[in-house]
């Protein structure tokens, strides 16, 4: 059997150069892209940035503030000094999927790109996985175990997280690298808890939905199929309009 080598990176879809670089490295590569409802994806993405490092990737813990700050950040203001991927703070760009998918279609051809929806994966993970196996030319009639992984997590004690993140380098050097790694791993697990993500504010939902809803038809045309979040986005704008009329 011929082995399949895979690589998964978070920002390859967002990157303007990744598609051409992958093509250069592996001309016959097959690309798998998973897309999610922008409302859900951006809320989860923001929570992950906040969790990654206290104040480093995203110091604005309120997603509404982070969403509004994007306009200023794109002209060089309110940028966290220690953020690792500046474009990760451009929420509107992150979930504008059409130009991103188009780059891969244009570079590899549509037949070499498999786009799957998170909604389908959540509803039937096994069948979605088999679809991917078929695309890769792998045996797909196999038993699959698809447990839920990577639930939403939060930091129990932010003060502990801050202290660990700001230990002086001179003090760190007193201890072996392996021991430091074990310490961070153990403390990190103790200081982390699984917590359901709170409901997004209805007005914020309306604002985000109003931005992405008009962009959904272009994605549908590109992919040649219906987009599962088209109606939910439209409904999110209408629900808040109804609330406003009642008030």
Predicted regions and their residues:
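Anion-recognition interface
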Residues: 1-247
